[in-house]
Amino acid sequence: MKFVDEAEIRVEAGDGGAGTVSFRREKYVPDGGPDGGDGGDGGSVYLVADENLNTLIDYRFERFHRAERGKNGQSADCTGRKGADLEVKVPVGTRATDTETGELLGDLTKHGQRLKAAQGGYHGLGNARFKTSTNRAPRQKTLGTPGDVRMLKLELMLLADVGLLGMPNAGKSTFIRSVSAAKPKVADYPFTTLVPNLGVVRLDAMSSFVIADIPGLIEGASEGAGLGIQFLKHLERCRVLLHLIDLMPADGSDPVDNAKAIVTELEKYSPKLAAKPRWLVFNKVDLMFEDEAQDLCKKIADAMNWEGEYYSISAVQGKNTKELCIKVMDFIESLPEDAIEESDDEEVGFKWDTYHKETVENYEDDDDFDDDDDDDFDGDDDDDFDGDDDFEVIYQK
């Protein structure tokens, strides 16, 4: 299946159903009071994280998602049915952003987590709501309020504990193959890896972590060179980055310049990402004598002004890879647990929160029984349901 990590969709919540104007009509009850029911609330749109999905490709072709409208009220004080909510399933790790306002709606980081993306409209009020001691036959009603409409940008960001950085052909895919069951394509030409790959490193029955391999970076990636920096976002959730450096690049380039180029591109993309814990890992030590490899590792580290510890491995032979994974596991376990923010269904603001209350409070009934075409009995006999009832609509969409 093609890997797609970005998509734009339009979500439309359902409008609220309108209230109705109706009067009780029964045998021996010639002058029944108002019994117009309220409408139903419109359905809302929710994003739901689903661990069975791993790409946003479906939303490249299915871009419009609309919840059900609330039903209108009926006579006999019958309330309209609420519109059904719509659930849009997305992969775990999806981030939703409003494209028009730039507002970050939230991250879906756990299976089953729900995020309200669009609030359904509020129901309209029937004329029974406007009955007062001085106005026994109100002809007012309100229509339902419109539901939210949003254009959302969905971004899938892989959930991994460890991220791999490096130039093309630095040995990232070979490393993830050697320490996990993942089998990304490996070849001796640049950009063999075109999409991110995940692997689970399992040290024992109780200790494991997830590692992410992304396509290699080259100098000028922030300006679009190579595959650009579009995949760096998949490292934003990682807790530690492993910067793999090829000691003997096939193109004869300088390892020091290559390493510095990666750091530069990382800082251009995101200073926050560049500030994450980063370990230097020198790969392909099997291509030279051990003393020569150690001297070269120290030379590169000194040229980068590296003050921390660094590691040397041979991914293809599995040399020192297990020891490195054990140290990574110990480091991850020493970090405090990240607080996962739960999405609140009520986070998304809705402009009609006090609409009904204000409508009823501001309503001024007209009981002067004059001829100014208001809500009193003006001789039009609007109780006969002749299709020409003159009633006042408080809210018009």
Swiss-Prot record:
It is an enzyme of class 3 (hydrolase). Residues 1-159 form the Obg domain. The keyword Transmembrane does not apply. Keywords: Cytoplasm, GTP-binding, Hydrolase, Magnesium, Metal-binding, Nucleotide-binding. GO terms for biological process: ribosome biogenesis. SUPFAM superfamilies: Obg GTP-binding protein N-terminal domain, P-loop containing nucleoside triphosphate hydrolases. It is found in: Cytoplasm. Residues 22-44, 359-389 are annotated as: Disordered. Transmembrane segments: none annotated. GTP binds at residues 166-173, 191-195, 213-216, 283-286, 314-316. Its EC number is 3.6.5.-. Signal peptide: none annotated. Residues 361-389 have a biased composition (Acidic residues). GO terms for molecular function: GTP binding; GTPase activity; magnesium ion binding. Belongs to the TRAFAC class OBG-HflX-like GTPase superfamily. OBG GTPase family. This is GTPase Obg. The gene is obg.
